[in-house]
Every structure is written in C-alpha cells, then in structure tokens.
From Swiss-Prot:
It is an enzyme of class 1 (oxidoreductase). The keyword Ion transport does not apply. One of its GO terms (biological process) is symbiont-mediated perturbation of host innate immune response. Belongs to the aldehyde dehydrogenase family. Keywords: Acetylation, NAD, Oxidoreductase. One of its GO terms (molecular function) is aldehyde dehydrogenase (NAD+) activity. The lineage of its organism: Bacteria, Bacillati, Actinomycetota, Actinomycetes, Mycobacteriales. This is Probable aldehyde dehydrogenase.
Length: 507
C-alpha cells in the first residue's frame, strides 16, 4: 500500500500553483479581463488554486497564436511531428506518478486508476499517433495511360477542442495527439470542473512544442466554450461531453459549415448470458468484475455499463454474487493505492447522482446495495463521495433511460437472446456495450446485433489507442482512436494530372 502525499505537502511529488494563467503562444498569459475562479479538490471540497475565467477575448488571443503557428507546423515533415509526439509521450511517462497525483487532486479519481489507466493511456495515444502519421500514405490512381490522380493528406489548420471533466489528461491526449500528428494547431478548453491537471500537464510538456501549436484557455462553457465552437476562425471542433451540450456545439459549427467530432452520452447495456455461471472459475470471476465496472472512475464514464441485463436462469445467483463483489469495493482516500472508488468530480455531480437515487425509489426500483452518500470522516467528509449502488427494476424506468454519470447500475433480467438484444437496443444512446458468454457464436452475434459503436466481449473498459471509439444514435458523430482518426483532422486533396500533350477535343 502507498499513500501519496497531497500536492504541495511535505514529500509531495508535485505542487499546484496558487493561481494559473492561460497557455497561449508558448507563454503563460493572464486573462484579458483579469477574472479568475476558485477550483476545489473533490477529495476534500476545499479550493486549491485559481484558474482564468476566460471569455471571447482570450479565445481570440489563442486563435491568433494558433493561426500564426499553423503554416509552419502544417508543413513540418511527419517524421518531425512524430518525434515531438514521442518526446511528449516520454515526458508524460517520466512524470507519470506526479501527473497521477495531479489528476487525483483535480478530479477525485483513485490514484490506482490514474496510475494503471489514465496516464499510461495518454502515453499510448501520443506514441500511437506518432507512429500512425509516419505510416500514413497518400494514394495514386492511374485513370488512363496519360492521366493520374494523386491524393494527398493536408491538415485542416486551426482546430477547437473542448474536453470533459471525467478524464482531463487522457481526454486532452485523445484530442491533441491525432490533431497534432495530422499537422493542425489547437485551442483546447478544459472543463471548468477540472481545469488544473491539464495546466500542470502543459507546464511539463509546453516547451516541447513550437509556440502556438497548442493553446489552453480555461473558463465556463457559455463564456469560453461557445466563442471557441462558434468561431469562424477554426476549421473543426471536437467535443466530448453530454448530449445536450453536443447539440449546441453542432449548431454553432453548422453556422460556419465546419466538421465536428462529438463523443456524447451513453446508457450502456452489459449483458450476462446464463453460461457465465456454468462454473465458478476464473471466467466467472472476470464476469463479476465486469458487472462491477459500473463503478470504475465513480461511474463517470460515457460508456459506463449502467444497465446490467442478466439472463433469468441465473438472475438471483449472479446478482447475489455481484452484490457481494460490489459491497467489497473499497472507498477511502483517493491518494491511497488501495482505494478503489474515489470522489465524484464535483458537488454538483454528487447532487445529481443523489437526485437519481430518489427518482429510482419513487419509480419503485429496489436498492440492493449502496444508495447513499459515503461518509468517510476527517477532512474527507467535505469531499464528494457516493456509495456504489445497485438498483433492480425494469427498462422503462428513468434510471434505465437517463445518463446518471455516477456509480449506479440498474439491473433487470431477460428471457432469451432476442429479449436481451431488444432491451439492450431500447435506448437513445449507442456508445458502448458489454457481452459476456462462454459461447463464441452467442458473443459474436450479440456484438454485431447491439447498436453501439464499441462492444466489449468478455471484457469491459479497455481503451487502447489503436481501437476505434465512438457512438451510434445520440451518442455522437465520428470516431476517436485508431489511425482513421487522422482523417478527421485532414483534408484530402486530389491532384488530377494529365501528362498528355493533346487537347481533349471538346472545343
């Protein structure tokens, strides 16, 4: 067991500044109108730094810097951009523990998750896209003996990126790595709930990039996010967050006819077929962990398996075992490596989760585990902690339909394969899903029949850089991860060349 020291305390791996500025043009720049807001840690609820409350004037400054850098960066050789991305990955890797502590203090997640997933995945994404851009090739088509079509990949230019509060550092990597690899410059706006860890990241890697290639502007959605997304000076906007905000982002972008990538909400089904209990072996244990994945990152994951569908033949036995597994989840100090469940990212989010607990009760759903705010004592009592909660009910309830974004799972049963698929697809969303079966044919069929962009089969919550991620239905537009993501940040130019000396003969 290791308990990391809190930022700024004796023996700490990192310290936060008491006041941050925006990162624009390779420099730390104060907000134009001199406004700041307090940023509390969800671990204790106490403020620990101030962050710029930026507005359109600051966005314009960042766009000036990004446009100044765009021509030079866009013309660098792919190998040069790849080398810089690899240096960023190395710098993150070297400071992994410090970045994990920074992320915990800003977001509230347990440090074991940040060390095992968030930071290594950020490294993985920079390294992957460094390799992908070097491997990307154009295309040549011979139209006839004298005519050739060349296809080139060219950067879009300046892109706007708005990231959520559930994985601040990782989401910055998801957005920045492909955009930079493709030769774009970026203006990034972190979520106002978790602005500090991305600023700490920039303090570590900012010197590796030419000035203006990456610019970070903080602030609230209406004051900074809207001016960025609606600007006619960006060539694309990429957004991760809730579906309602995604609709607004799409409206803003539509006025300028620019492309969008949207990764939005989810209400992911996690299906357990009867054969998972054919034996009480490693596979069964893995499936029970798969059920409990609804509590990973405090349920603050767009693909949270927040609907569990258990085949009726094993419903009672499996649910009993799953409840035991869930009740064994350890809550405590997020900086303790033994802690499995940290705090919600904000008090507002905690209150939202608690409101859905009441909604579930009013609908007649039954709580079989959790259901209350977690009281941890000491100075953690001011933090935003929630017990992992299991409801049982029916798929027509609001807790089955609406995204809660907390450690809450709604459980129901199904009779057969068709019933399972029907329940799974009875949702507005289609971001993720899980399928658990020892039968390969069943697992494959279910994976194909579920209407979701990412279906985990006999696993859950794996996010490798080289696997495409994105949603069906109201869960978004476009994909992240995988080399295909490069094309979301590129124009395709066709150069159609005739090598014939002869006229076409029309006139």
């Amino acid at each position: 067991m290791t308990v990391f020291s809190r930022p700024g305390s004796a023996g700490a791996l990192m310290s936060y500044e008491s006041r941050y500025q925006n990162f624009i043009g390779g420099q730390w720049v104060a907000p134009v109108h001199g406004r700041y807001f307090e940023n509390p840690t969800p671990v204790t609820g106490q403020p620990f730094c101030e962050v710029p409350r930026s507005d359109a004037a600051d966005i314009d400054k960042a766009l000036d810097a990004a446009h100044a850098a765009a021509p030079g960066w866009g013309k660098t050789a792919p190998a040069e951009r790849a080398a810089i991305l690899n240096m960023i990955a190395d710098r993150i890797d070297k400071n992994a523990a410090a970045l994990a502590v920074a992320e915990v203090w800003d977001n509230g997640k347990p440090v074991r998750e940040a060390l095992a997933a968030d930071i290594p995945l950020a490294v993985d994404h920079f390294r992957y896209f460094a390799a992908a851009i070097r491997a990307q090739e154009g295309a040549l088509s011979q139209i006839d003996e004298d005519t050739v079509a060349y296809h080139f990949h060219e950067p879009l230019g300046v892109v706007g990126q708005i990231i959520p509060w559930n994985f601040p550092i990782l989401m910055a990597a998801w957005k920045l790595a492909p955009a930079l690899a493709a030769g774009n410059t970026a203006v990034l706006k972190p979520a106002e709930q978790t602005p500090a860890s991305v600023l700490y990241l920039m303090s570590l890697i900012g010197d590796l990039l030419p000035p203006g290639v990456v610019n970070v502007v903080n602030g609230f959605g209406a004051e900074a996010g809207k001016p960025l997304a609606s600007s006619d000076r960006i060539a694309k906007v990429a957004f991760t967050g809730e579906t309602t905000t995604g609709r607004l982002i799409m409206q803003y972008a539509s006025h300028n006819l620019i492309p969008v990538t949207l990764e939005l909400g989810g209400k992911s089904p996690n299906i357990f077929f009867a054969d998972v209990l054919a034996a009480h072996d490693d596979f069964c244990d893995k499936a029970l962990e798969g059920f409990t994945m609804f509590a990973l990152n405090q349920g603050e994951v767009c693909t949270c398996p927040s609907r569990s569908l258990i085949q009726a033949d094993i419903y009672d036995e499996f649910l009993e075992l799953a409840a035991i597994r869930t009740k064994a989840v350890r809550q405590g100090d997020p900086l303790d490596t033994e802690t499995m469940l940290g705090s919600q990212a904000s008090n507002d989010q905690l209150e939202k989760v608690l409101s859905y607990i009441e909604i579930g009760k009013q609908e007649g759903a039954v709580i079989i585990a959790g259901g209350e705010r977690a009281e941890l004592g000491g100075d953690l009592s001011g933090g935003y902690y929630m017990q992992p909660t299991i409801f049982t009910g029916t798929n027509n309830m609001r807790i089955f339909k609406e995204e809660i974004f907390g450690p809450v799972v709604a459980v129901t049963s199904f009779t057969d394969y068709d019933d399972a698929i029907g329940i799974a697809n009875d949702t507005l969303y289609g971001l993720g899903a899980g399928v658990w079966s020892r039968d390969g044919n069943t697992a494959y069929r279910a994976g194909r029949d579920i209407q979701a962009g990412r279906v985990w089969v006999n696993c859950y919550h794996l996010y490798p850089a080289h696997a495409a991620f994105g949603g069906y239905k109201q869960s978004g537009i476009g994909r992240e991860g995988h080399q295909m993501m490069l094309q979301h940040y590129q124009h395709t130019k066709n150069l159609l060349v005739s090598y014939s000396d002869k006229a076409l003969g029309f006139f």
